[in-house]
């Protein structure tokens, strides 16, 4: 993917990713990378991430969520890429 191009990622993260600070970890990393969007816990125990920004920043964010905070145990990260829709302002944790 072309560096600097605005893209959107939709990701589903599974493993021990709830109750371990995963959403706040993701929010901090996204804000540091100047990525917009949101992250939330899902009822099936996974975490959902929707984010937009430069391709290189999103790639860095996806690398970070593969690791997660020390207390997390990430099993899978399923990612779908699409064109950015400029749909978000800032980055937040959804409840």
Curated annotation (Swiss-Prot):
Read off the PROSITE patterns from this record: ACYLPHOSPHATASE_1, ACYLPHOSPHATASE_2, ACYLPHOSPHATASE_3
Gene Ontology molecular function: any one = acylphosphatase activity
Keywords (A to Z) from UniProt: Hydrolase
Q: Which InterPro entries match?
A: Acylphosphatase (IPR020456), Acylphosphatase-like_dom (IPR001792), Acylphosphatase-like_dom_sf (IPR036046), Acylphosphatase_CS (IPR017968)
The name under which this protein is listed is Acylphosphatase
Q: Which Gene3D superfamilies match?
A: 3.30.70.100
Question: Which Pfam families does the record match to this protein?
Answer: Acylphosphatase
Acylphosphatase-like domain sequence ranges: 8-95
Per the UniProt record, the source organism is: Salinibacter ruber (strain DSM 13855 / M31)
Instruction: Provide the catalytic activity annotation.
Output: an acyl phosphate + H2O = a carboxylate + phosphate + H(+)
Report the EC code(s) recorded for this entry: 3.6.1.7
Q: SUPFAM superfamilies, per this entry? A: Acylphosphatase/BLUF domain-like (SSF54975)
Recorded name of the encoding gene: acyP
Q: Which domain of life is it from?
A: Bacteria
Instruction: Quote the catalytic residue positions.
Output: 23, 41
Give the family, as the similarity comment puts it. Belongs to the acylphosphatase family.
């Amino acid at each position: 993917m072309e560096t600097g191009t605005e893209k959107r990622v939709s990701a589903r993260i599974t493993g021990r990713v709830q109750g371990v600070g995963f959403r706040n970890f993701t929010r901090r990393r996204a804000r540091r990378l100047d990525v917009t969007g949101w992250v939330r816990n899902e009822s099936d125990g996974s975490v959902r991430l929707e984010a937009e920004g430069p391709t290189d920043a999103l790639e860095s964010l996806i690398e970070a969520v593969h690791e997660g905070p020390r207390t997390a145990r990430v099993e899978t990260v399923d990612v779908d890429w699409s064109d950015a829709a400029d749909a978000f302002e800032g980055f937040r944790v959804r409840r």
